[in-house]
């Protein structure tokens, strides 16, 4: 795994969700520190670090309650709701490891380093992708939780890493398992792991 330069970003802990690169989703934010982090991001490049917390009920998670790998994400849209909460639309861009967290009274900043994903060899890549997609199609066929449109979206994805993350996002597995996949920088390992989960 080769590492890229470190950077500082506002930290946004998430309950019960892991965000992958290229994933676009709405989040409803009510915690004051998280709102402050978002507002700070909006004054700059609109980037934040989204990281899952280990225990969803914790209102003020400390460093030990956060996973150490999150996703650098861009705020696409932010809407302040009448009840004081915020609805924000985010798009994940890159996996990142947390090196340090600087918490002040308002919000936390994380020093993070993007994790560059290891590419597959072309032949190995083609086989791994083909096998994983074929098994995922069967999974979608028997699962009531995955919309069939997901398969249509997969056909338009050329990048194996992005394809693996898209499949992972739609798997009915627990938070710890989704986090485990996020922490895998090897695309081959991700595809193989997804295959093992689909076989369960």
PLM regions and their residue ranges:
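N-terminal low-complexity, acidic/polar interaction/targeting segments
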Residues: 1-198
